[in-house]
A protein has these predicted regions:
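Alpha-helical coupling/stalk and coiled-coil linker elements that connect catalytic or binding modules
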Residues: 1-373
Length: 373
């Protein structure tokens, strides 16, 4: 409604002698439109988060009752030639993987499978410390797992999309101070023609022509590059947004164990990069509203400033994406193990001795599928 009012007042300005009051009304309607749209987006996000948290709790309750169908069973990782995973049902329906997996990304799923089938002996103790720490954070894990309720983040797809976006060619002119100065001067001149047409005898057609020229310049210089960026992200815009939320959630951690500190440090350094990538992707998506695109380009040069943000992101962050996605996948897998540890508190950490011989001692043994025996 407010958007239609904005257009209506702009039209009235061009066909009536009412002058600046119609422009003021158009500006107020535009501000109201932006405010209502942002409030609606935030409300949708809160509702979706609440529904996702409820689903997480329902799944965990079902898990405690012996139902693992909602979770990934890892069937794709079954290898009949593996030394042990095939014989002891590590992967597949009702498997160990099926009981453990809570990953929110495909990269985390792959990493969890690797931990179970090819563990790194040199990091066993550090990994156990990280799992114990995450197991002690049920509220944090619950909100983290909520990010993967609707669908898992396609880690490889997101990485490919971000690499493709990083390769989009942007002219260096867009970051020049001179470009910004010229753009702001042109915008100020456009607003000046509007004011002069309202308070003097200057024909309103002058403002209309200057606005059309300004809009044509912005679209002509920016539209092609931004469309290329939109094609690069394609259908992965929602996936990238989900991945950004996962990164932000990890950044909220205050780790104490050595492995988590290292991984968190890597991901925390990526927070600004992924957050900016998320903002850019959302802005690219909003360009699908043609009328909104015209208005925001006309009065705010939105495409030009979006292209500047995009160019700065390419320059500052594009080369570090692989390292960051690997760290996120590692934490994702650790969260799954931590959830399993939390759900089975009777399980204890094995104590490794320095003896040369082969020996073992166990008390209160239990099987993950059969329980205590």
């Amino acid at each position: 409604m407010f958007f239609a009012m904005t257009l209506g007042f702009v039209v009235l300005y061009t066909i009536t002698p009412w002058g600046w009051p119609t422009l003021a009304a158009a500006a107020l309607a535009l501000v109201a439109y932006v405010g209502v749209r942002r409030a609606d987006e935030r409300n949708d996000e809160r509702r979706e988060q609440a529904e996702a948290l409820r689903e997480v709790c329902q799944r965990e309750r079902a898990c405690l009752d012996g139902t693992f169908a909602p979770f990934d069973d890892g069937q794709r990782y079954v290898d009949a030639h593996h030394p042990y995973t095939f014989d002891i049902d590590v992967f597949g329906p009702q498997s160990l993987y099926n009981r453990i997996c809570r990953t929110v990304s495909t990269g985390g799923s792959d990493r969890l499978a690797a931990m179970l089938s090819a563990p790194r002996l040199d990091t066993v103790d550090a990994q156990a410390d990280a799992v114990s720490e995450l197991a002690s954070l049920p509220d944090w894990r619950k909100h983290y797992c909520a990010e993967g309720v609707s669908a898992k983040v396609d880690t490889e797809g997101v990485a490919r999309a971000l690499h493709a976006v990083a390769k989009v060619k942007v002219g260096q002119w867009v970051l020049l101070p001179l470009t910004l100065a010229v753009a702001l001067t042109a915008l100020a001149a456009f607003f000046a023609t509007i004011v002069l047409a309202s308070v003097t005898t200057m024909p309103s057609g002058v403002a209309v022509v200057s606005g059309i020229a300004l809009l044509a310049a912005v679209l002509g210089l920016c539209h092609g590059t931004l469309m290329e960026a939109m094609r690069a992200t394609g259908k992965l815009q929602e996936q990238i947004t989900m991945f950004v939320r996962v990164v932000a959630h990890i950044a909220d951690l205050k780790p104490e164990s050595a492995m988590l500190k290292q991984l968190h440090g890597e991901v925390a350094g990526a927070t600004a990069a992924f957050a900016e990538a998320g903002h850019i992707v959302k802005a690219l998506d909003r360009r699908g509203n043609i009328l909104g695109l015209i208005l925001f380009d006309l009065f705010l040069l939105s495409d030009l400033f979006l292209l500047r943000r995009f160019a700065r992101w390419q320059k500052d962050f594009a080369l570090s994406m692989d390292q960051w996605t690997e760290a996120v996948s590692e934490i994702d897998a650790l969260v799954s193990m931590a959830t399993y540890a939390y759900n089975t508190p009777q399980g204890v950490r094995a104590e490794v001795t320095d003896d040369d011989g082969v020996s073992y001692e166990g008390r209160g043994l239990r099987h993950p599928f059969l329980g205590a025996k």
